[in-house]
Amino acid sequence: MEAHGAKPPSRNTLTAYLGVLERLYLVERLNGWAAPVRATSRVKVKPRYLPCDPSIGVFACGLNERGLLRDASVFSRALKSMALRDLLVYAGTLEPGVEPQVRYYADSDGLEVDFVLLLADGRWAAINVEIGESQVKDSIKRLQRLCKKVRNGGTLGEPAFCAVILASTDRPRRDAATGTFVFSLTTFGA
């Protein structure tokens, strides 16, 4: 990680920089969800950071529209950043005066869910963000795995809903087998 003989910044320096970026509303901290699961897998709770404005990350990577469409990794992160921004805005209307709690879920079994919305009354929702239709089936399976782990934990009920948010789809729908909503980011607040 050393470039031209320079040492990488220390963990304390990086933490301080992230704190400044967070206070300037340039990045959004996303903490891990310490889900009430009864399993041998270890739940990861270390914070992740996403740009508050997805264009910041795209600009930092030096990409234009064409470059973004060719770089699936950056496009996916930008899409997740947009989804988080919208989720925080719309979730804030569910309980006026209460800041919405949005987390991610990851464990040592390799299960990852992009966002978990937690409401003060105990309701929760699991949400994944994907680039395209080809990822929906696997994404729904991951959401269902999380629901099963939480159900087996015994202290939290079923989610209020599960959803897969896509970059684009002409088929917004509810999966018949699981009840999972599938829709595009552009219809998120409609």
Predicted region positions:
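Active-site ExK catalytic segment of metal-dependent nucleases
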Residues: 122-135
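Domain-level recognition of nuclease-like catalytic cores that cleave nucleotide substrates
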Residues: 165-190
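Hydrophobic/aromatic beta-strand patches that form the interior of the parallel beta-sheet core
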Residues: 50, 103, 125-127, 163-165, ...
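Mg2+/Mn2+-dependent nuclease catalytic core
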Residues: 132-152
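Switch/connector loops and helix/strand junctions flanking conserved nucleotide-binding motifs
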Residues: 59, 136-138, 171-176
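Arginine/glycine-rich "motif VI" loop of SF2 helicases in the C-terminal RecA-like domain
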Residues: 92-96, 145-158
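Accessory nucleic acid-recognition modules appended to NTPase machines
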Residues: 1-123
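Short glycine-/polar-rich loops that comprise or flank the Walker A/P-loop
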Residues: 122-124, 157-161
